[in-house]
Amino acid sequence: MKSLKLIGLALGASFALSASAFAQDITIAVAGPMTGSESAFGRQMKNGAEQAVADINAAGGVLGKKLALEADDDACDPKQARSIAEKIGSSKIPFVAGHFCSSSSIPASEAYADSNVLQITPASTNPLFTERKLWNVARVCGRDDQQGLVAADYIVKNFKGKNIAILNDKTTYGKGLADETKKALNKAGVTEKMFESYNKGDKDFNAIVSRLKRENIDLVYVGGYHQEAGLILRQMRDQGLKTILMAGDAMNDKEFASITGPAAEGTLFTFGPEPRNKPTAKAIVDKFKAKNIDPEGYTLYTYAAIQVWSQAVKKANTTDAKKVMDTIKAGEWDTVLGKLGFDAKGDIKQIDYVVYKWDAKGGYAELGSKGS
């Protein structure tokens, strides 16, 4: 486990002075995969959190105090996530923006609830995160049942009569997304020709690719993360398959193209409407660009999660997690993603997934729009 105070802390001329200054800070946390196979997404979250805290502090802070940011590494490991949640709770930190993986967010949320910590995830899409109706959870992203429906709708309209395969990596996120997509496809009258799983971290997919080839699969839907999806795609091309690969929001990192090279061209994935293109995000995107940082993927979602919390704290005039959560669910909040409102479970009311396509140059664009 790694923890680091990142923002809002400055060394004073003496220990006494600095200790006095630190006492005035409100520490919040961002938790996600800062190391490990999903660390690209951890970097996105950390970048978004750092900028949000810096901007809030520049505008005067919260309740007359500055914010300090603690970054915690769960490596997308459920046990490590639970341990981090217990540590954050014992530290009396009132709010965490996290986690990334649903398999981390779900067990961590229970520990946060026990410790009176409010949790807003920028990225965990498994429906179970909010369906358990814990009082302390919310998300600024959509859900797998929603993006599975969008993916299925695209497949039905564009691959009618074609052979479809569905793969998943057995994780809470990947299996959940594959199941939701399968459910939506089957409801629309499409039966997949192949439904198979693999283990997260696998490198050799030749057996799966060989079966895809035998079954004459036209489109393979992958419920999983970009590393394995990239290897599956590369190995398909090595065997001469022109099968289209489609996946979910975990494909939204340019590391995918570094794995596949030009083979990325034509790959599809679902995600929210490009946050970097929203008018509400322009000023913040410009700040990132000035630092030579691309605020891709979940960078702006993490920024928005902290915006929602800070605005609700100001309105409630307290950092008490239960009072702040009641305030969040009762209002609408101006964020880089636009106005966000939440239902009683903590899901956003404004749901809008779209389909993206990768190009040969390592970029991607929303279908029907110009490239990113």
Go through each PLM region and give its residues.
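Extracytosolic ligand-binding ectodomains
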Residues: 2-11, 22-372
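N-terminal signal peptide c-region/cleavage motif recognized by signal peptidases
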Residues: 16-20
